[in-house]
A protein has these predicted regions:
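N-terminal membrane-targeting hydrophobic helices
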Residues: 1-158
């Protein structure tokens, strides 16, 4: 998603509307998004990571944890993506579950999920802040939360 957004904003002259209403749905980009949102592939990655832990413990653990986080992400994605749903069971199926609710679209309750996500991020940031030792990392955490809050206010409130 970050590569897509970087390409669309820095490498083209597309408007924000063109990026999210057109380019996002191009088959090339959908295939890439669906690859990284595939529960079967993530399960294979977890299995490979667990197997690899016997030979390369740090690499195997990293792979298993990253792929497990993909699965967790997909379990949140499934009930919160409407017309922008992913093929979460690819390559076994091309089915897309189009939820009646959306994590971002205000017409489908997105403002409630976004508010929950913002509140969760702020609460967890208070917890994480105590772990951070340097002023730089603490400042980056505060900055990212202010950025998150700004986007929330701009998109849902103002």
């Amino acid at each position: 998603m970050f590569v897509f957004f970087g390409w669309a904003t820095l490498g083209t002259d597309m408007t924000s509307r063109q990026i999210w209403d057109e380019a996002y749905y191009w088959p090339f980009w959908q295939d890439i998004f669906d690859f990284w949102n595939s529960i079967p592939l993530a399960l294979l990655g977890v299995g490979l990571g667990l197997w690899l832990r016997k030979r390369r413990p740090q690499l195997g653990t990293l792979l298993a944890v990253c792929c497990a986080s993909i699965i967790l992400h997909c379990l949140v994605d499934l009930p919160t993506h409407a017309e922008d749903a992913h093929r979460h069971f690819w390559p076994l199926s091309n089915y897309r579950f189009e939820s009646p609710i959306s994590y971002w679209d205000p017409e489908k309750g997105g403002q409630f999920f976004a508010l929950f996500e913002l509140a969760l991020a702020l609460v967890l940031s208070v917890y994480v802040f105590r772990w951070l030792r340097s002023r730089l990392t603490q400042s980056l955490l505060i900055f990212s939360n202010l950025l998150f809050l700004t986007f929330f206010l701009r998109f849902y409130v103002l």
